[in-house]
UniProtKB/Swiss-Prot annotation:
NCBIfam families: PRK11760.1 (NF008734). It is found in: Cytoplasm. Belongs to the class I-like SAM-binding methyltransferase superfamily. RNA methyltransferase RlmE family. RlmM subfamily. The keyword Glycoprotein does not apply. HAMAP family: 23SrRNA_methyltr_M. This is Ribosomal RNA large subunit methyltransferase M. The gene is rlmM. One of its GO terms (molecular function) is S-adenosylmethionine-dependent methyltransferase activity. One of its GO terms (cellular component) is cytoplasm. The lineage of its organism: Bacteria, Pseudomonadati, Pseudomonadota, Gammaproteobacteria, Aeromonadales. It comes from Aeromonas salmonicida (strain A449).
Length: 364
C-alpha cells in the first residue's frame, strides 16, 4: 500500500492536500490526495509506492504548515473481529523493523472522540502483543521508528510508521496542555503550544528564561503576556484595551495604551516580540520585518489570520514575502510556521536569527 497519512485540523484537509502535493512534487514524488471534508486527515497516494518512505524520511516535517503528523501507511484492515483485533495487526506488520514507540490514534473530530477512549484502552494489550513478537522494543526507544495504529472505526484501521527524527513527537500531533487557572484567556495556550513546537526543549533555559525583556503587541486582556510572565520575563504590553489586573499585580508588566503597529521601543534590549492582532497578514508581515530591520527584537512569535479561500496559497505567499524582507537584513533568519492545535483560521509563525541564538549559547 505505502501511502502517506497526514493529520490536520478538521476543515483544512484541502490545505493539507495542496501542501503535500506541492512539497512532494518539488522532490519529484508524484501522486494524488484523497480528501474527505472535515475528516481531520488526508491520504496521499503515490504512483511509486517506494516514495512514501522517501517522503517520510526526507521531506522536513518541521517545514510543513497545515500537517500535524506524517506517516507511511502500509496496511488497511477492515471488518475486524472485535473479539480479536490484535492477531490481524500482528500478521500484517510481521515484517516491520522493530519500532521504539506505539501510538494508537484517531482523527481529531467530534465523531472520532468516541474512539479515543477505546484507543487508550487498546494501547496496552497491543503494546504487549507487539513486544512479545519483537515488533516493539521492551522500553520506549526514541531513535527507532514509531508504530501507528490509526482507527477510523472500532473495526477499521490504518497501520503504518513514522520516523522519530521527522515526525511530531506528540500523540495525534497535538501537545496536551492545560489552561492555567489564572490565565486571562485561553489564547495563553496558543503561545505555550508555539513554544513547545518551535523552540527545542533543551534551549528553553536559554531562549525562554527569567529576566528577558519582551513586548506583546495587541496584548489585551493578556493571554500571551501571561505565558511570558510565568517564565519570569519583564513584559511591555501594548494595547488600547484593558489588561487583566492579575498580570498587572505581578509587577512584571508595563501597559502602554498605544497602537501596536505604531509603537517602537526606545532601547534595543527587547528579546521576544509576540503579536496576536486581528489584522491583514500583509500588514503584520511588514511590521515584523521592520522590527528585525531596526534590531528592535531578537526573536518573534506571531499569528497570521487566513482568508476564507486560498488559505494555503495565502499562507505561503506571506511567508515568502517575509523571507524576502528578512533576507534584505541578514541571511541567517529562520522562519517556521504551523497551524497549531489552538489556532483556528490562522497560522503561527516563529522567526529567529541563527547568529543571535548562537551568541546566546556562547554566553553560556
Amino acid at each position: 500500500m505505502n501511502n502517506l497519512l497526514l493529520y490536520c485540523r478538521p476543515g483544512f484537509e484541502k490545505e493539507a492536500a495542496a501542501e503535500i502535493t506541492e512539497r512532494a512534487s518539488n522532490m519529484q514524488c508524484y501522486g494524488f490526495a484523497r480528501v474527505k471534508d472535515d475528516s481531520g486527515y488526508v491520504i496521499f497516494e503515490l504512483y511509486d509506492e517506494e516514495q512514501a518512505d522517501l517522503l517520510a524520511r526526507k521531506l522536513p516535517f518541521r517545514e510543513l504548515i497545515f500537517i500535524r503528523q506524517m506517516l507511511v501507511v502500509t496496511h488497511e484492515l477492515k471488518d475486524l473481529d472485535v473479539a480479536d483485533r490484535i492477531s490481524p495487526i500482528i500478521e500484517a506488520t510481521s515484517e516491520y523493523t522493530i519500532c521504539g514507540d506505539l501510538r494508537v490514534e484517531t482523527a481529531d473530530t467530534n465523531e472520532a472522540k468516541e474512539l479515543s477512549a477505546f484507543c487508550r484502552k487498546f494501547t496496552v494489550p497491543l503494546r504487549q502483543a507487539l513486544r512479545s513478537k519483537e515488533l516493539l522494543t521492551k522500553k520506549e526507544t526514541p531513535h527507532r521508528p514509531v508504530f501507528h495504529a490509526f482507527f477510523m472505526a472500532n473495526d477499521h484501521l490504518l497501520l503504518g510508521y513514522s520516523y522519530s527524527f521527522n515526525n511530531s513527537e506528540f500523540h495525534m500531533g497535538i501537545p496536551r496542555l492545560r489552561c492555567p487557572p489564572d490565565a486571562p484567556s485561553r489564547s495563553s495556550l496558543k503561545l505555550e503550544e508555539a513554544f513547545y513546537v518551535f523552540v527545542p526543549r533543551e534551549e528553553w533555559d536559554l531562549r525562554l528564561t527569567s529576566g528577558m525583556k519582551a513586548v506583546d503587541l495587541g496584548a489585551c486582556p493578556g493571554g500571551w503576556t501571561h505565558q511570558l510572565v510565568r517564565r519570569g520575563m519583564m513584559v511591555t504590553a501594548v494595547d488600547n484595551g484593558t489588561m487583566a489586573q492579575s498580570l498587572m499585580d505581578t509587577g512584571q508588566v508595563k501597559h502602554l495604551r498605544d497602537d501596536g503597529f505604531v509603537w517602537r521601543p526606545s532601547k534595543k534590549n527587547i528579546y521576544w516580540l509576540v503579536c496576536d492582532m486581528v489584522e491583514k497578514p500583509a500588514r503584520v508581515v511588514h511590521m515584523i520585518a521592520d522590527w528585525f530591520r531596526e534590531n528592535d527584537c531578537q526573536e518573534a512569535m506571531f499569528n497570521l489570520k487566513l482568508p476564507m479561500k486560498k488559505r494555503y496559497a495565502e499562507a505561503v505567499h506571506n511567508i515568502e514575502v517575509l523571507r524576502g524582507l528578512l533576507k534584505e537584513v541578514d541571511n541567517a533568519f529562520v522562519i517556521q510556521a504551523k497551524q497549531l492545535y489552538h489556532d483556528r483560521e490562522e497560522i503561527t509563525v516563529h522567526v529567529y536569527n541563527k547568529y543571535w541564538v548562537s551568541k546566546l549559547e556562547a554566553k553560556e
